[in-house]
Amino acid sequence: MLNADKNRIIFDLLRAALFQKDIALPNNVDWNQILQEMKIQTVAGLPYEWLCNRNILDTKIKMYWNQIVVFQVSFWVKLMREQELLIQLMRKNNINMVILKGSAAAIYYPRPDLRTMGDVDFFVHPQNFQKAYHILLKNGYQLAYPEDHAPHHITLRKNNIVFEIHKTLSIIATNNVGNNEDYLQTLLLKGLSSIEQKKIENWEFPTFPRLQNGIVLLLHVIQHLISGLGLRQIIDWMMFVNSELNDETWRLEFQPILRKIKLEKFAIILTRMCQLHLGLRIEDITWCHSADSLLCNKLLDHFMEKGNFGRKLRRKSIQSGQIIYILSTNRTPLKFFKRLQDSGIHNWKLAKKYSILRPFAWIYQAFRYTWQGLNRKHPVQSILSDWEKSKKQVDLFDELKLFDE
């Protein structure tokens, strides 16, 4: 089955399952290929009920698909239980928190339990970050990575569930929001003063208000735009728009903010892409109709090219992707130098230990990237290929007005 045909079937299944669209499937579908691809995209659970109601699957593939969905729903229940215990612990210690993504995105799905869940990400005020972290340690949560593994969060585990406590977002911490990091951080902190309680079945949890929750989901798409985007992140945004972002809400609430942080065009293109290919309704979501359909298709092609919507990459490809990331998003000398310096401090153990070495971290990182490039099969061709891919990404990001100063 050709990739284009396979992707079209996946898109159609999602249109039917999420929005009850009428679709016509070909007769010779390789359902094993479709299932494997949807597993990789972490969306396998979404069309299962629709397929079963139409007796489309043969017994063997239906049984296999059912096992995946049963496991997924079981994990969802376990995660929601652990999330509830976390919320109770934070509440007991007078720490305001909100859930990021996860169940805060699942609330917009027709069947929230069929959205594949990953970690429990939650946000606290930076002033409460260390307090909350030490409370977690005292209550049986264990470090999954060193404390300084990331500048914006700490990762812990308990009962086989991963928790990430955030004091900001990754894309803000790495300053990939066009020098709007302070503005966005202030906006998130403002959201902590207007926490909303949401409910899925018997599970209640705190979320940001509509504006902050939507911006978090949009920033999450951008965060994964380069390293490999999954269909799940796109669908999270699409389902949010479907529930919350009609023309009036866009005009009064979102457009002024997104225009200020230079993400208006990206939101328009992404949303129109969802209308053209994934079944998002057109009625009362006309704010994205100015989008260039060719650019929508370019963006979709980019998602497909970046590892089939986030397919797990080989180590060498990941290293290549990191270099492309640097070239694509840090186009001024100052930003490029700062990225090298920040990455060098993060990766150079001696610089972490001895502060006298930190001013030279950018040199360490430059040599590190050079070594990664040369330590590959056909290094010259690989570096030229990376450069061409970077140029292609820069052109796309320019059209989308992303990563501008």
Predicted regions: what they are:
Residues 1-118, 124-405:
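Conserved NTP-donor binding/palm subdomain of two-metal-ion nucleotidyltransferases/polymerases, i.e.
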